[in-house]
Swiss-Prot record:
Subunit structure: Adaptor protein complex 2 (AP-2) is a heterotetramer composed of two large adaptins (alpha-type and beta-type subunits), a medium adaptin (mu-type subunit AP50) and a small adaptin (sigma-type subunit AP17).
Xref: SUPFAM superfamilies: ARM repeat, Clathrin adaptor appendage domain, Subdomain of clathrin and coatomer appendage domain
Modified sites of kind Phosphoserine: 632, 634
Tissue: Expressed in the Garland cells, imaginal disks, adult midgut precursors, the antenno-maxillary complex, the endoderm, the fat bodies, and the visceral mesoderm and cells of the CNS and PNS including neuroblasts, the presumptive stomatogastric nervous system, and the lateral chordotonal sense organs.
Protein name (database record): AP-2 complex subunit alpha
Source organism of this protein record: Drosophila melanogaster
Protein location: Cell membrane; Membrane, Coated pit
InterPro entries: Adaptor_Complx_Large_Subunit (IPR050840), AP2_complex_asu (IPR017104), ARM-like (IPR011989), ARM-type_fold (IPR016024), Clathrin/coatomer_adapt-like_N (IPR002553), Clathrin_a-adaptin_app_sub_C (IPR003164), Clathrin_a/b/g-adaptin_app_Ig (IPR008152), Clathrin_app_Ig-like_sf (IPR013041)
Topological type in the membrane: Peripheral membrane protein
Molecular-function annotations in GO: clathrin adaptor activity
GO cellular component, one term: plasma membrane
Family statement: Belongs to the adaptor complexes large subunit family.
Region (Disordered): 651-679
GO biological process: asymmetric cell division; clathrin-dependent endocytosis; endocytosis; follicle cell of egg chamber development; intracellular protein transport; mitotic cleavage furrow ingression; positive regulation of autophagy; positive regulation of endocytosis
Length: 940
């Protein structure tokens, strides 16, 4: 039977049918192998294949590849199809190349030449196929090879409209991967004037291209503003006939209108020319007027298109923020949407009003819709709409309506969705502090927050109320009385106990004159909560008790009894034992004057802006109005562990000597008019394995990079900045190691010329041999690639290899270096030993060249369980019940190298009183003792 000619390929259809009918994986593989053998024989046979046959077999290969099987032949036949004059054959050839051929192929020069031939063709179909192939591949090589031809096609008067459209989209694709390929100078004006093209497809594609170009170089393309305003005006004004044939459900050119409105939002102010600005305002008013007209169709497509243009026009009005009349009209229009039946419209209206609320011209107008927004918060079925209503209430809040909004949010908080409670708590806390005229109201609000949603009250919130109470003398007595009453509730959240314990410890004497809150009553009330709390809260309460001894000497005996109970083995927590023991001795030994000095009232905290704002912005960077986010110029806020330490260790009266970060969050200063840069708002992608870029190519000031932590673990995030995240997973066996580096592109554009290079000298390679596989030179937007490294320890070494990573981002060269987590301890093998064999070996390694010792200050308050956890991750065997002193930690292990095995013993002795460590390392090789000692010093 003669083969079927035309587009229908019977053989391909039969093959696909056979594959679908396979009952098992084995049957499928067998059928595929049979077909591959047949195709290979046809390609290698003496009989010349015609275009139809080549097309059919190439299609089969493409189908097999899409099933997940590797294809290692047929590439030349596909390239030959590019020379065909038949559309169907040329199309299949381009399809095969786009999918299977990579930029490193030996055939790439032939492919590029074939594409150039098609670009010069007079057949627009062939030109379009070539442009689509270039855009699909989109590599740097393609950009460099066709950087001259494509712009010429785009602006040439001889080019057909359909080709111009494809050329604009192709150039946009290449620009995203290689921003430097777009020519400047006279080309700029010619590209901009495409906005006047009469073909709908050309002007739409050109607008997308110009929008991308403007974002990169707004000054060079500023001439597009006048043309965009003029074109937009002609589209939306009925007296013109521009593109009136391109209507979508009675809306003229809605997609182009939206693109033009977005293009204009790249400039602020949009234009300085009075005539252009007047025409733009007239156009925006026309769009708002059309929104008030009765719908011309009941179909949803009409309303969708009409509202798309309207919302983008409102976004431009908000962006300009200079026309009070337009802002008020936009607000009124959005207010009508708040009661619309369509959920999406209500959501978009709330979102746009959040931005309008930040403008001085429309803030009061937004407030007129407060009752409707409150109703949306309570009654909406969709949680995302309720969330947006909360955001709008937060944005419209000021001194005039703060108490009402805060109360409504508190009322709703009791029944709010769990997914939005934490964010609501932060917003209520910020509003209560920012607009408090009476700080007793602020205290009431925060305590209500803890009572209603205690689990969602972060540490920053209750630290903040403590600081404000300490800094505001007029509210201290009220705060003490209020927390005392709150603690009398049968069920009391632990955060309430923390706040109550701290405030009563400082100001309990202000309410002690009332018999209902006598000293003993305060103590018993707090202690009744003690056994229900976590160790951290118990530690804070013990500090409160020692403060009580200074405030109320008459209950000294009661408190000392509690200290005695917890200074012995009845307390399983070593920190509580130590704290109780020290406080007991302090209360017994110290005189009244000494006790009063040590336990004096906490001093006022330095005034600064609250960082709860930064916490809120980090949680929802896109949901917080920018003018509400002001970055503090004060030192960094307190970390969780350090804050707790400052709270529970105040009895030592050494706050000023603690870490620079160990102070509570600062009191808010009067709000500034400057918009903070929000440097704390950049979210990190911490869980890659388990949203300002600097112009300097080496600017990594905001990078997260700490290789020290990898002394004790093998997996995690090695490096992170705004553009790139590098994760690592590693495994080691004896003297061999294998690392997987995961490079994640966090940007919206590809990183090109991506090149990690190992920095490791030939001399160093004699000790540690590291081999690294090559990675692809382009890291696509949002993508992740993996690079494998192997390491062989030949002999012990002191330093670790460095990897230098370079790439181009938006045309700017970026380069930085990081150390690989390949310290010598990675080649440890844990060794079990009993006490007798350990100390026998310890004694044998007593020579001067067999030991290294260092005494160093603890980097943080002594954390023995934490130190043990670190040592267990270091690679050696942590030996239990070997050292007579249970606080001491001893380890044993063998470092495997190619040349020898080096036994190593380690002893870490903590001194709790001095807050110091003594580290001793003994090994049969002097260099190993120094290397291990240097690695572990200052790590505890």
């Amino acid at each position: 039977m003669a083969p079927v000619r035309g587009d229908g390929m019977r053989g391909l259809a039969v093959f696909i049918s056979d594959i679908r009918n396979c009952k098992s994986k084995e049957a499928e593989v067998k059928r595929i192998n049979k077909e591959l053998a047949n195709i290979r024989s046809k390609f290698k046979g003496d009989k010349t294949l015609d275009g139809y046959q080549k097309k059919k077999y190439v299609c089969k290969l493409l189908f097999i590849f899409l099933l997940g099987h590797d294809i290692d032949f047929g590439h030349m036949e596909a390239v030959n199809l590019l020379s065909s004059n038949k559309y169907s054959e040329k199309q299949i050839g381009y399809l095969f190349i786009s999918v299977l051929v990579n930029t490193n192929s030996d055939l790439i020069r032939l492919i590029i030449q074939s594409i150039k031939n098609d670009l010069q063709s007079r057949n627009p179909v062939h030109v379009n196929l070539a442009l689509q192939c270039i855009a699909n591949i989109g590599s740097r090589d393609m950009a460099e090879s066709f950087s001259n031809e494509i712009p010429k096609l785009l602006v040439s008067g001889d080019t057909m409209d359909v080709v111009k459209q494809s050329a604009a989209l192709c150039l946009l694709r290449l620009f995203r991967s290689s921003p430097d390929i777009i020519p400047g100078g006279e080309w700029t004006s010619r590209i901009i004037h495409l906005l006047n093209d009469q073909h709908m497809g050309v002007v739409t594609a050109a607008t997308s291209l110009i929008d991308a170009l403007v974002k990169r170089n707004p000054d060079e393309y500023k001439g597009c503003v006048n043309l965009a305003v003029s074109r937009l005006s002609r589209i939306v004004t009925a007296s013109y006939t521009d593109l009136q044939d391109y209507t979508y459900y009675f809306v003229p050119a809605p997609w182009l209108s939206v693109k033009l409105l977005r293009l204009l939002q790249n400039y602020n102010p949009v234009t300085e020319e009075a005539g252009v600005r007047a025409r733009l305002n007239e156009t925006l008013e026309t769009i708002l007027n059309k929104a008030q007209e009765p719908p011309k169709s009941k179909k949803v497509q009409h309303s969708n298109a009409k509202n798309a243009v309207l919302f983008e026009a409102i976004n431009l009005i908000i962006h300009s923020d200079s026309e009070p009349n337009l802002l008020v009209r936009a607000c009124n229009q959005l207010g009508q949407f708040l009661s619309n039946r369509e959920t999406n419209l209500r959501y978009l209206a709330l979102e746009s009003m959040c931005h309008l609320a930040t403008s001085e011209f429309s803030h009061e107008e937004v407030k007129k819709h407060q009752e409707v927004v409150i109703l949306s918060m309570k009654m909406e079925k969709d949680v995302s709409v309720r969330q947006m209503a909360v955001d709008l209430l937060y944005a419209m809040c000021d001194r005039g309506n703060a108490e009402e909004i805060v109360q409504e949010m508190l009322n709703y908080l009791e029944t709010a969705d769990y997914s939005i409670r934490e964010e609501m708590v932060l917003k209520v806390a910020i509003l209560a502090e920012k607009y408090a005229t009476d700080y007793t109201w602020y205290v009431d609000v925060i305590l209500n927050l803890i009572r209603i949603a205690g689990d969602y009250v972060s540490e920053e919130v209750w630290y903040r109320v403590i600081q404000i109470v300490i800094n505001r003398e007029e509210v201290q007595g009220y705060a003490a009385k209020t927390v005392f009453e709150a603690l009398q509730a049968p069920a009391c959240h632990e955060n309430m106990v923390k706040v109550g314990g701290y405030i009563l410890g400082e100001f309990g004497n202000l309410i002690a004159g009332d018999s209902r809150s006598a000293p003993l009553v305060q103590f018993k009330l707090l202690h009744s909560k003690y056994h229900l709390c976590s160790p951290m809260t118990r530690a804070l309460l013990l500090s409160t008790y020692i403060k009580f001894i200074n405030l109320f000497p008459e209950i000294r005996t009661n408190i000392q009894d509690v200290f005695r109970q917890h200074s012995n083995l009845r307390s399983a927590d070593a920190e509580l034992q130590q704290r109780a023991s020290e406080y007991l001795q302090l209360s017994i030994v110290a005189s009244t004057d000494v006790l009063a000095t040590v336990l004096e009232e906490m001093p006022s905290f330095p005034e600064r802006e609250s960082s709860i704002l930064a916490v809120l912005k980090k949680k929802k960077p896109g949901r917080v109005p920018e003018n509400e986010i002001r970055e503090s110029k004060s030192p960094a806020p307190l970390t969780s562990a350090a804050q707790n330490n400052a709270l529970v260790n105040n009895s030592h009266s050494k706050l000023n000597n603690s870490n620079a970060n160990t102070d509570l969050l600062g009191l808010s200063t009067p709000p500034s008019n400057n918009i903070g840069s929000g440097s704390n708002s950049n979210s990190t992608l911490i869980d890659v394995l388990g949203d300002m870029y600097g112009s300097n190519s080496n600017n990594n000031s905001s990078a997260v990079y700490n290789t020290k932590k990898f002394l004790f673990k093998n997996n995690g995030v090695l490096f992170e900045n705004e553009m790139l995240q590098i994760g690592v997973k590693s495994e080691f066996r004896q003297n061999l190691g294998r690392l997987g580096l995961f490079y994640g592109n966090k940007t919206q554009v590809p990183l090109t010329n991506f090149n990690p290079v190992l920095q490791w000298s030939a001399e160093d390679a004699l000790k540690l041999n590291v081999q690294m596989k090559v990675v692809e030179p382009t890291l696509e937007a949002g993508a992740q690639i993996q690079q494998l490294l192997t390491a062989e320890c030949i002999e012990d070494y002191a330093d670790a290899p460095t990897i230098e990573i370079s790439f181009r981002y938006n045309g700017t060269q970026q380069k930085f270096s990081i150390k690989l987590p390949l310290s010598v301890n990675k080649f440890f093998e844990p060794t079990e030993m009993n006490a007798e064999s350990f100390f026998a070996r310890w004694k044998n390694l007593s020579g001067e060249q067999q030991r290294s010792q260092k005494v160093f200050k603890a980097a943080q308050p002594l954390d023995l369980p934490g130190a043990r956890n670190k040592l267990m991750g270091f690679g050696m065997q942590l030996l239990d019940q070997v050292d007579p002193n249970p606080d001491n930690m001893v380890c044993a292990g063998i470092i495997h190298t190619q040349s020898q095995q080096v036994g190593c013993l380690m002893r870490l002795e903590p001194n709790k009183q001095a807050q110091m460590f003594r580290l001793t390392v003994r090994a049969s090789k002097e260099t190993v003792t120094r290397e291990i000692c240097d690695l572990l010093t200052d790590q505890f």
